[in-house]
């Protein structure tokens, strides 16, 4: 699994939250603008793969499949 994908998924467990907004998920990319832009691509791919669900207003939640992959039961 790509390191950035892992960090994005791990943020849900680390922050113990069911939903996170895109600005919080940007932290997975660090401080560099290019890395933060890549977070947008990763989040879009995770939605397309059924691991994240869009909740509106830039909020995202792990799906059941995403929870399993992230190691959250």
Locate predicted features.
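Short amphipathic alpha-helical interaction segments
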Residues: 32-48
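Short amphipathic alpha-helical interface segments
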Residues: 1-31
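Minor-groove-contacting beta-hairpin "wing" of winged helix-turn-helix DNA-binding domains
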Residues: 58-64
């Amino acid at each position: 699994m790509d390191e950035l994908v892992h960090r994005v998924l791990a943020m849900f467990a680390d922050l113990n939250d069911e939903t996170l907004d895109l600005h919080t998920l940007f932290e997975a990319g660090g401080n560099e603008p290019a890395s933060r832009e890549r977070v947008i691509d990763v989040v879009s791919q995770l939605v397309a793969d059924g691991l994240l669900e869009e909740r509106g207003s830039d909020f995202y939640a792990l799906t059941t499949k995403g929870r399993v992959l992230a190691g959250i039961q």
